Amino acid sequence: MPVLFKHTRPLFGVWKIEETSDELLSMLALRSEYLPFLQNIKTEKRRQEWLASRVLLKELSGSELLIAYHEDGAPYLPDSAYHLSISHTNGYAAVLLQEQPAAGIDIEYYSTRILKIRSRFMSPEEDASVDPDNAVKHLLVYWCAKEALFKMIRQQDVDFIEHLHIEPFTYADSRQIKAYETRTGDPQSYTLSYEVRPDFVFVYSLPSGSGILR
């Protein structure tokens, strides 16, 4: 199907993956560039995700851009001023394009497993803010926010409790939140935005200076 939804400022979109990998590949012109990579992807699900992110990037940017990877695995666009972030979850792909270097997006399908692993990524202060009536959704927002922040800072040996911090917030279906990191030598704070959809949660970074809208 086409883009599930698209946002222009910042520029991002979510694609619901209903096509086969062959169908997705047919939507791209630079097929010969992709085949060597696809041959190394063993599962159909991963091939679908890999291709869907490129089809979505084409839809967002208006042209077919090749994705390269830094040594740490972070994707980038060699011939573009945009900075790129990509995320996948069960049946969905998300792509974010921003002019600022620190760009991060994360999307997660609903799963109660988040309740079992909350102690691995939530600080006591963050955990105390979780709405018991919306615990799964609230925790998924925290998780996605920290995943997006992790992508933004591009550091190794990151502890999600010690180094990645989300200012506790009251749950709502969408809002902006504040995040900061203490892993780098020059800690930074960031503004993130999230949305809770019927099947998934996603969080994305906002341009510097966006501030918090209440």
Annotate each language-model stretch with its function.
Residues 1-214:
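Core catalytic alpha/beta fold that binds nucleotide/phospho-ligands
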